[in-house]
């Protein structure tokens, strides 16, 4: 995480125009970001805005994802192969890839296998000299199980690395396209360690990506300059500015006045305004996500299955989607998105039935009701474009069956930290796919192991469910995996650790003269943007 000292150092690092001077020319693009980054190292970050500001601008990974097919394609690795037993993966690395430089460091060599080993071992090895730098928790690395899965990572030569696994894993390749798998410079890390400033690799990042960090003013702006040696072709827009704008209405106002040229996650109620302005354009992409309310199953009354089932029946999901999502979403019934491998189409759902909810609550001994807290997210997401409104509608639904829900919210970082610790009774949350694999939902969000890491917000541990998802990740055959996930979803439905609410399309808006910007599993790609 950043410190006050770090913020000051970054803010005073460059004699550049003031934050208000964001006029864009043909070589400057302004993006209205939703929030300040937690860190410029995606290995130790966990929020979407942090990943957009770091991994998707400053770094690359071994693989990328095809934006249409969502399948792995080469990036820093040009090819790969796996042994017949599925336990040994060998990657061939791209030659001629240069790292950026900054005022503390100028690289003397190109990207090679040493950088891959450093980026992996920092996260895996508790005795690595960088493991505890910046208080790194490496949440994603642990959530996908790489700390236990990887037995050994070896440098064969400068342009070949080999991973030896403890067991086969169907999602292993896709994991190396995730944000946390960004490749950092081992040479830079060594230099900063010798100078006694190891934290600089996280606050003054050096990567192989399309842009380099130039300036950061906390809660105000981030300035980047194009990488003149970018391996994937010339970057058309030389200057990129993130204008940090948490308020969704302010973001639209800035887009209308050309103070920024791209905004993420406009509210559905803003769609008519955007569509009605010839200078603006509204864009959408199909997304792999799910929004949900998680019951803390370790706390009363949600440790009682009857209560969880009752409140599923008490919640009018159709009304929520109609009122809040408008054209941007559809009702969800599974933890796995509908357009993903393993989704069970015939999975039943809880229909809106307040009387059935009352009957179940009576069986649970709560005929007189109960009081609980309902945490509401402070940010907008495709799977939850207006958390406060959704929370209020759920609060109203529950009140009809005798459950009084007190809505609370916190700053985003505090919200995430509190959920990881299990401080909530119930909480609105959601997930967007990191790698296109069903384990990223069924395992990451609901496995017993991930109660400890914090991504299992329901803190639900069901041994039969857990066994099924652990078996599924070992299987390479898609049909066999789908059967296992179908069985797991049946248990999920019966045990009701969540109220699955909705899946939402990813929307963003631009000035009409913007071209080349894309959004995919990898997030935002600024490397081809042009201002026409």
Locate each region found by the language model.
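Detector for C-terminal structural segments
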Residues: 26-29, 53, 170, 217, ...
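N-terminal lobe/hinge region of extracytoplasmic solute-binding protein
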Residues: 32-84, 121, 128, 206-208
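A structural "hinge/loop" feature
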Residues: 35-52, 76-77, 103-107, 172-182, ...
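Aromatic- and charge-enriched surface segment that lines or borders ligand/interaction sites
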Residues: 78-129, 162, 254, 301
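Surface-exposed binding/hinge segments that line
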Residues: 92, 124-125, 129-189
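Ligand-site clamp/hinge motif
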Residues: 199-202, 227-273, 284, 391
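Structural transition elements
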Residues: 211, 331-364, 381-389
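A bilobed periplasmic-binding-protein/Venus flytrap-type ligand-binding module shared by bacterial periplasmic
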Residues: 225-228, 285-310, 314
């Amino acid at each position: 995480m950043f410190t006050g000292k770090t913020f000051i150092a970054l803010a005073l690092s460059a004699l550049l125009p003031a934050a208000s001077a964001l006029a864009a020319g043909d070589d400057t693009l302004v993006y209205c970001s939703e929030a300040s980054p937690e860190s410029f190292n995606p290995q130790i970050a966990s929020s979407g805005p942090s990943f957009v500001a770091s991994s998707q601008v400053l770094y690359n990974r071994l693989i990328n994802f095809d934006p249409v097919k969502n399948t792995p394609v080469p990036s820093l690795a040009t090819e790969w192969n796996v042994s017949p037993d599925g336990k040994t993966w060998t990657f061939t690395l791209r030659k001629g890839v240069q790292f950026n430089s900054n005022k503390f460091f100028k690289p003397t060599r190109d990207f090679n296998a040493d950088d891959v080993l450093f980026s992996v071992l920092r996260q895996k090895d508790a005795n690595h000299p960088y493991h505890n730098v910046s208080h790194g928790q490496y949440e994603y690395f642990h959530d996908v199980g790489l700390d236990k899965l990887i037995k050994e990572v070896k440098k064969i030569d400068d342009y070949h690395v080999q991973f030896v696994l403890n067991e086969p894993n169907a999602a292993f390749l896709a994991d190396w396209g995730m944000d946390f798998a960004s490749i950092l410079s081992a040479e830079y890390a060594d230099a900063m360690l010798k100078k006694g400033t190891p934290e600089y690799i996280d606050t003054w990042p050096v990567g192989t990506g399309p842009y380099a960090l130039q300036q950061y003013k906390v809660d105000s702006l981030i300035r980047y300059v194009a990488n003149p040696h970018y391996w994937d072709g010339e970057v058309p827009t030389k200057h990129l500015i993130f204008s940090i704008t948490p308020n969704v209405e302010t973001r639209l106002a800035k887009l209308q006045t050309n103070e920024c040229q791209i905004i993420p996650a406009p509210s559905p109620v803003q769609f008519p305004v955007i569509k009605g302005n010839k200078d603006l354009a509204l864009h959408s992409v199909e997304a792999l996500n799910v929004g949900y309310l998680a019951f803390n199953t370790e706390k009363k009354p949600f440790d009682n299955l009857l209560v969880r089932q009752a409140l599923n029946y008490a919640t009018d999901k159709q009304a929520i989607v109609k009122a809040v999502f408008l054209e941007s979403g559809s009702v969800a019934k599974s933890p796995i998105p509908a357009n993903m491998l393993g989704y069970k189409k015939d999975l039943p759902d809880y229909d809106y039935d307040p009387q059935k909810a009352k009957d179940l609550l009576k069986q649970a001994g709560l005929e007189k009701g109960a009081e609980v807290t309902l945490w509401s997210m402070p940010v907008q997401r495709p799977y939850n474009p207006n958390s406060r409104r959704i929370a209020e509608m759920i609060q109203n639904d529950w009140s009809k069956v005798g459950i009084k829900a007190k809505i609370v919210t916190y700053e985003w970082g505090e919200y995430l930290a509190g959920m990881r610790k299990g401080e909530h009774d119930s909480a609105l949350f959601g997930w967007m796919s990191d790698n296109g694999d069903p384990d990223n939902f069924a395992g990451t969000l609901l496995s017993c192991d991930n109660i400890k890491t914090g991504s299992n917000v329901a803190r639900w541990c069901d041994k039969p469910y857990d066994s099924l998802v652990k078996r599924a990740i070992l299987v390479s055959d898609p049909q066999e995996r789908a059967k296992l996930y179908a069985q797991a979803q049946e248990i999920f439905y019966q045990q009701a650790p969540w109220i699955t609410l909705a899946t939402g399309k990813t929307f963003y808006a631009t000035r009409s003269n913007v071209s080349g910007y894309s959004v995919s599993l990898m997030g935002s790609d600024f490397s081809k943007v042009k201002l026409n």
